[in-house]
């Protein structure tokens, strides 16, 4: 199957085949149908990759590629994952059904615009008609970018990047099919429509958030996370925890504004809703029961399997509801990595793993947001395992939930706040400046922020426990 034919088939499978999701000639028609007396949204959507979960399912992906009619596949990974059973099984699966493939293994942990551009250039260099990502969030996000821009070769890099740095345009061509095989219990990227990268010149991170970049298939194999190093398990687990907490406490979808003029411009991050709530709560329950076990005993197969399940579940939750302050404040932290050395990660550069940067401000963030929706913070604390009465006051709820978060950090012995990663009080202005470009525009945050609030949240995060 040629790349152009594959795009054509995907286009026919897209929104235009559904009358309600087809573009309308009048951009205000949908809003008029529901009246003009309300500026917030009135609907939510469930967007998710097909998910296949089970021990050994990596060996099935060759059949999936063959069933797509694909002729030339690009297999993307990083140099560490390339030596794992996950990658070897992925290769074996393709060889079993004689799929032609090539390998790109130059993915950067915590990808940058430059590293993604390198993958994009490779993807454009030959007529690949399908993509497979085997790795953690960095690999999956890089593969999303490679597949998207290879499917839209005339686009500039910032065309699809979200504001304030990019244009957030809709691509002309649908993305060629991507199969994601996660090797960490944390990213959730295998089910989501987002890809994150670093923009060093802005000392911050940004992302692409488009429904079309969600993987065609997520192949979630517990065998692929059994060899996760200790700190990878911790930091990817922190990401799961914050995905679930942020999506569950996000502003409800029907309080988010502005109301979209057309369904195809409804944002990927819609706000909390009844479907995302189910996935986020279940992820929190699993985390409360299995997170510590999965770290303290790497041979605990049940715990690692459950945390991988929580990762995908939280991915479905935040992939539709969204994330807010923890992630928004994390991007300048990881982008401006000081003298932090992350054990169990490549040591060729200063690195603050994404999950650690997200967790660093979590205590301050949820202390700040509790008053906006105390009932949700209460349920979150209870679901994580706290014995807290339903009639608890806001202060008790906030203290209980935040003590749970501190407990994870202390028990795992991670760097204690920003100071533990090499930042000082004098760095707060730089962090605040970088965050102020995007954090105040996070419309699903349960409480609005400004520059002063952002600065105070960073200050409270200098030391956490």
UniProtKB/Swiss-Prot annotation:
GO terms for MF: alcohol dehydrogenase (NAD+) activity; hydroxyacid-oxoacid transhydrogenase activity; metal ion binding
GO biological process: glutamate catabolic process via 2-hydroxyglutarate
UniProtKB keywords: Mitochondrion, Oxidoreductase, Transit peptide
Stored Pfam families: ADH_Fe_C, Fe-ADH
Reactions catalysed, as given in the entry: (S)-3-hydroxybutanoate + 2-oxoglutarate = (R)-2-hydroxyglutarate + acetoacetate; 4-hydroxybutanoate + 2-oxoglutarate = (R)-2-hydroxyglutarate + succinate semialdehyde
Cellular location(s): Mitochondrion
Lineage top rank: taxon: Eukaryota
GO annotations of cellular component type: mitochondrion
EC number(s) stated in the UniProt entry for this protein: 1.1.99.24
Main location class: mitochondrion
InterPro entries attached to this UniProt entry: ADH_Fe/GldA, ADH_Fe_C, ADH_Fe_CS, Alcohol_dehydrogenase_Fe, HOT
PROSITE patterns recorded: ADH_IRON_1
Residue runs in coiled coils: none
Similarity remark: Belongs to the iron-containing alcohol dehydrogenase family. Hydroxyacid-oxoacid transhydrogenase subfamily.
Entry function: Catalyzes the cofactor-independent reversible oxidation of gamma-hydroxybutyrate (GHB) to succinic semialdehyde (SSA) coupled to reduction of 2-ketoglutarate (2-KG) to D-2-hydroxyglutarate (D-2-HG). L-3-hydroxybutyrate (L-3-OHB) is also a substrate for HOT when using 2-KG as hydrogen acceptor, resulting in the formation of D-2-HG.
Name assigned to this protein: Hydroxyacid-oxoacid transhydrogenase, mitochondrial
Classification lineage: Eukaryota, Metazoa, Ecdysozoa, Nematoda, Chromadorea
